[in-house]
Amino acid sequence: MSDWLDAVKWDAQGLVPAIAQDAASGEILMVAWMNREALEETARTGRGVYFSRSRHKLWRKGEESGHVQTVSEIRLDCDNDVILLKIEQLGGIACHTGRRSCFFHKLTTDDRGHADWVATEPVLKNPDEIYRR
């Protein structure tokens, strides 16, 4: 493996969190996990590749949906334990729910102090149409 991969502080499962940020707007679109293979492939191909913890395999973003992420820059945080990908989100949808961003729930508080999560971003495309379920 390359020295640059050894600089990353991988967790006990060999993973590191990765933030996908729109390179133009700065908007955070999603957070996922990467293993060494995913990070290496991302750097090599310029496409967002992650590790699916539920499926235990590489997840090439957009492979099923067509919503590919083109990576323009890869950064490592000051503690070497978080990756930041500056990306262009092709198709404008990063979330499997059919929204632009996975961060569509906003904590709101009513007049009585009751807090709740409210979906604030529209569904751009029905997930059933995206994934042909």
Curated annotation (Swiss-Prot):
Which residues of the sequence carry a binding annotation for Zn(2+)? Answer: 78, 95, 102
What cofactors does the UniProt entry give for this protein? Mg(2+); Zn(2+)
| Catalytic activities | 1-(5-phospho-beta-D-ribosyl)-5'-AMP + H2O = 1-(5-phospho-beta-D-ribosyl)-5-[(5-phospho-beta-D-ribosylamino)methylideneamino]imidazole-4-carboxamide
Cite the entry's keywords alphabetically: Amino-acid biosynthesis, Cytoplasm, Histidine biosynthesis, Hydrolase, Magnesium, Metal-binding, Zinc
Family of the protein in this entry: Belongs to the PRA-CH family.
Q: Name one Pfam family in it.
A: PRA-CH
Gene Ontology annotations of biological process type: L-histidine biosynthetic process
Cofactor stoichiometry and binding? Answer: Binds 1 Mg(2+) ion per subunit.
* InterPro entries the record matches: PRA-CH, PRib_AMP_CycHydrolase_dom, PRib_AMP_CycHydrolase_sf
Q: Where does Mg(2+) bind?
A: 77, 79, 81
Q: Name one GO molecular function term.
A: phosphoribosyl-AMP cyclohydrolase activity
Q: How does it assemble?
A: Homodimer.
CC per GO annotation = cytoplasm
Subcellular location(s): the record lists: Cytoplasm
Q: What does this protein do?
A: Catalyzes the hydrolysis of the adenine ring of phosphoribosyl-AMP.
Classification via NCBIfam families: PRK00051.1
**In which pathway is this protein known to take part?**
Amino-acid biosynthesis; L-histidine biosynthesis; L-histidine from 5-phospho-alpha-D-ribose 1-diphosphate: step 3/9
HAMAP family attached here? HisI (MF_01021)
Q: What is its EC number?
A: 3.5.4.19
According to UniProt, the name of this protein is: Phosphoribosyl-AMP cyclohydrolase
Please tell me whether the keyword Secreted is annotated for this protein. no
